[in-house]
């Protein structure tokens, strides 16, 4: 989002927008932490370890991890691996969602009581949330992260096909508009007018 908007809109405006989106996501995560037994983890790219930890502390997030290299599936897998030993479900949510609310994440947690996988479809064909049940977290070979055409409009569809192949039960949340590109911002602003 930042680089795309920077090319078309000026770096300062895109940085302010990304900061607002990220602050909103932090606020939702903190609210969820207060209401449910959920520990937010901040996965960061573009910062060194010290700056990432400082930023997390400033936002009230104690656990901060670097995303590392690789495609989105590789980076998500890297964040999920350390959680396996806790035998808990995991939610991964993007920070480019102007309309995400605590109730969306609570709905994901509720759906994990009876489903292996929860997806929040994005209007562009991706997803804004992926959540894995505690049982699914114990079998990384079944995680729907490999062989997905990341960055395409087929991400959600291919993830659902993967889930079907592995007999994973899936719940879908409401579709949301994430802001990956300038056209997404224009579309979102048009819907808000």
Residue ranges and their predicted role:
Residues 37-47:
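Short beta-strand/loop segment that forms part of the nucleotide-sugar
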Residues 155-193:
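Conserved alpha/beta core of the MobA/IspD/sugar-nucleotide pyrophosphorylase nucleotidyltransferase superfamily
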Residues 18-36:
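A short, N-terminal amphipathic alpha-helix
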Residues 53-89, 149:
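Short phosphate-binding loop-to-helix
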Residues 100-125:
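Conserved donor-nucleotide/metal-binding helix-loop-beta segment in metal-dependent transferases, i.e.
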Residues 1-16:
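Glycine-rich N-terminal loop/short-helix segment of MobA-like nucleotidyltransferase
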Residues 93-94:
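Active-site acidic Asp-centered loop
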Residues 137-162:
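Short, glycine-/small-residue-rich phosphate/pyrophosphate-handling segment
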